[in-house]
Amino acid sequence: MALHSMRKARERWSFIRALHKGSAAAPALQKDSKKRVFSGIQPTGILHLGNYLGAIESWVRLQDEYDSVLYSIVDLHSITVPQDPAVLRQSILDMTAVLLACGINPEKSILFQQSQVSEHTQLSWILSCMVRLPRLQHLHQWKAKTTKQKHDGTVGLLTYPVLQAADILLYKSTHVPVGEDQVQHMELVQDLAQGFNKKYGEFFPVPESILTSMKKVKSLRDPSAKMSKSDPDKLATVRITDSPEEIVQKFRKAVTDFTSEVTYDPAGRAGVSNIVAVHAAVTGLSVEEVVRRSAGMNTARYKLAVADAVIEKFAPIKREIEKLKLDKDHLEKVLQIGSAKAKELAYTVCQEVKKLVGFL
């Protein structure tokens, strides 16, 4: 069994080595059982327009492109900042409902709760013993978050990227959908995989990034910043559960400029261009087609047209979320089944890692 596993690992390594290290644009793939996708999302905060267009839509698509797909509600990551236990418990179920409503299908992918698979933390510890402290301290997100917290970040926040690497490598994932702000963390994952392989023999595939074609959705109030769950300005972020009235209000108040024409110029007209990009994404039209159809419309009217398109896109998802949240038992069962499937995969890999390291 060990020889078979090592042979399979070499096959995966040969495939990965044939690709250049780094990020790759999302390929149009036939289903391939030799490839595995992993991604995760924190349960805290309500899913917003940027999350949906930048991540969840591609998650749904990837289910049909790969035979092996795992999506995790990464609750361990969420406690790097203080959480109310009761709120966190409910947030996990709420995020499960949202993901299912958006199109994540447990028949096509494994949807599970990270904390219910203890191998994540076991592998994280092993990997943390292979990375130097300065490497983690120089990551952009660590510096940004500790600056915001007045340099009072926890050890958990510092080692967050190592747990993230363990999440990915634990399932011998070959592909990871990521946003632009996660590229540096993916480089750490790749380096840890290569470092482990160099020390213990070729075992982990070196995962490739799948960059979403949708650029980061910007804040409606500050187009220089990305849309965020934690933005204190309530008008900045469009949440998937917002009412039609709230969505209209947020787009009406969206920052643009003093030119009334609708054009796409991210460098020169960031606010309008952000709204055009959102419009294109929710309708499936190209940016050029959106601009063409908006000829003669001023930005005030155009913002309301985009609000209507977003409302139409989210309406069936909202209805399904409300329906799913009424059935707590179903949501818990989905997570239990998914976590059991993930545990089966994780246990095998973790046992092999323990043998290689010398624990067994």
Swiss-Prot record:
Principal localisation: mitochondrion
**GO CC terms, sorted:** mitochondrial matrix; mitochondrion; nucleoplasm; plasma membrane
* Stored Pfam families: tRNA-synt_1b (PF00579)
Its Enzyme Commission number(s) read 6.1.1.2
Q: Name one GO biological process term.
A: mitochondrial tryptophanyl-tRNA aminoacylation
UniProt keyword annotation of Manganese present: no
One GO molecular-function entry: ATP binding
Instruction: Name its cellular compartments.
Output: Mitochondrion matrix; Mitochondrion
Binding sites annotated in the UniProt record for L-tryptophan: D167
Tissue expression profile of the protein = Brain.
Q: Keywords for this entry? A: Aminoacyl-tRNA synthetase, ATP-binding, Disease variant, Dystonia, Ligase, Mitochondrion, Nucleotide-binding, Parkinsonism, Primary mitochondrial disease, Protein biosynthesis, Transit peptide
**Could you tell me what reaction this enzyme catalyses?**
tRNA(Trp) + L-tryptophan + ATP = L-tryptophyl-tRNA(Trp) + AMP + diphosphate + H(+)
The record's CDD domains line, in alphabetical order, gives: TrpRS_core (cd00806)
Q: Where are the transmembrane segments?
A: none
Binding positions (ATP): Q42, H48, L49, G50, N51, G179, E180, D181, V217, K226, M227, S228, K229, S230
Outcome recorded upon mutating H77Q: In NEMMLAS; uncertain significance
Instruction: Please list the disulfide bridges.
Output: none
Question: What disease is associated with this protein?
Answer: Neurodevelopmental disorder, mitochondrial, with abnormal movements and lactic acidosis, with or without seizures: An autosomal recessive, mitochondrial disorder with a broad phenotypic spectrum ranging from severe neonatal lactic acidosis, encephalomyopathy and early death to an attenuated course with milder manifestations. Clinical features include delayed psychomotor development, intellectual disability, hypotonia, dystonia, ataxia, and spasticity. Severe combined respiratory chain deficiency may be found in severely affected individuals.
Question: Which NCBIfam families does this entry report, sorted A to Z?
Answer: trpS (TIGR00233)
What family, per the record? Belongs to the class-I aminoacyl-tRNA synthetase family.
Its annotated function is as follows: Catalyzes the attachment of tryptophan to tRNA(Trp) in a two-step reaction: tryptophan is first activated by ATP to form Trp-AMP and then transferred to the acceptor end of tRNA(Trp).
> What is the name of the protein in this document?
Tryptophan--tRNA ligase, mitochondrial
What gene does this protein come from?
Answer: WARS2
